[in-house]
Amino acid sequence: MAKPTRKRRVKKNIESGIAHIHATFNNTIVMITDVHGNALAWSSAGALGFKGSRKSTPFAAQMAAEAAAKSAQEHGLKTVEVTVKGPGSGRESAIRALAAAGLEVTSIRDVTPVPHNGARPPKRRRV
């Protein structure tokens, strides 16, 4: 049988891009794209090995943002616009981690979808 060949990652030279931070109550996903929306790098708290309730911590979001930034910098990325979506606890720490990783943050946009009284929300938790 033929040996499976691994697809070689092509190095793109892209100066600026968009960092999409999706912060839910259970996880934080950081995806870095070029200005047209084509993915360069992504990472999440779960993909880094955090399990269960540890995925939803600000530290896990920070680690996910650092991993995505490091991977995107290999493509020559220097500046990012940040879009944040969701109510999760990892919003602020992910933005700080992107800046600390050496990416210049030019703007921060909150694109959390707000319903115009759509579907009924889940019932209140009683702890």
Swiss-Prot record:
Belongs to the universal ribosomal protein uS11 family. GO terms for molecular function: rRNA binding; structural constituent of ribosome. Part of the 30S ribosomal subunit. Interacts with proteins S7 and S18. Binds to IF-3. The keyword Zinc does not apply. Pfam families: Ribosomal_S11. It comes from the Bacteria. The gene is rpsK. Keywords: Ribonucleoprotein, Ribosomal protein, RNA-binding, rRNA-binding. This is Small ribosomal subunit protein uS11. GO terms for biological process: translation. SUPFAM superfamilies: Translational machinery components. Located on the platform of the 30S subunit, it bridges several disparate RNA helices of the 16S rRNA. Forms part of the Shine-Dalgarno cleft in the 70S ribosome. GO terms for cellular component: ribonucleoprotein complex; ribosome.
